[in-house]
């Protein structure tokens, strides 16, 4: 099965080792992709645990689950991954999800830092194009599966 983060790798060889705790992301982009996957498969404990120590205060898995309830995350596009310093990177991405039968995008530039030798999500800047979007049903699916949107992820609308 292809990974939920839309990489070319299978889930087992991409994000699963990070989410299961058998391995740690070696780059900010790997962490960002695994956090997206954790949202997609509803592993909110992993999302919480990968916040920076400063930002993790007061965040619970239950809070994350409540804020994401109703969202079905299905596609991710990484635009840029910038390695500015050895202990901090930024990743610009767009994540796509369905909620209440509507299509949304989250376009963010995220800041990641290294704490105790591990990459952590610190914060992000949302871009102005976040929100509900229209996407042609006959266009290629956003997940990169080489099918038309209407024959691929659009069939998963709840």
Q: Predicted regions span which residues?
A:
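Short helix-adjacent coil turns
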Residues: 35, 39-46
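Cysteine-centered loop/knuckle micro-motif
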Residues: 13-15, 150-153
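Short beta-strand edge/turn micro-motifs at domain boundaries
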Residues: 107-134
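Short solvent-exposed beta->alpha transition segments
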Residues: 49-78
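Short Cys/His-rich zinc-binding micro-motifs
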Residues: 1-9, 137-146, 154
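Surface-exposed, charged secondary-structure patches
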Residues: 68-105
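Short, low-complexity N-terminal intrinsically disordered segments enriched in polar/charged residues
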Residues: 1-34
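Long C-terminal interaction/binding lobes of large macromolecular proteins
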Residues: 90-92, 119-123, 129, 139, ...
